């Protein structure tokens, strides 16, 4: 299945809200309109610095289970400024969720 961006938001925003994610950004083939049935879903999530790796992995598991697809769920707190992933996020990123 190829989800629309709105479908991804609808499925994941309750998880992000419950788990206190600060911001989640979709990037990769889904934002470029190149996604196929075999495409994974690329998401970078910014979380509180105090969040444990176990809690972050729990969020990733919930996201994967909700979407039923392979997901590259990245810890955005450690993305290198102006590195490859940072540039991809700036170029192609679509905001899925932002805590108010």
For the regions a protein language model found, what residue spans apply to each?
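Catalytic core of pol beta-like nucleotidyltransferases
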Residues: 1-23, 32-37, 49-100
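Conserved H-loop
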Residues: 29
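Short, conserved active-site loops that position catalytic residues or coordinate cofactors/metal ions
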Residues: 39-41
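Short hydrophobic/aromatic beta-strand micro-patches
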Residues: 44-48
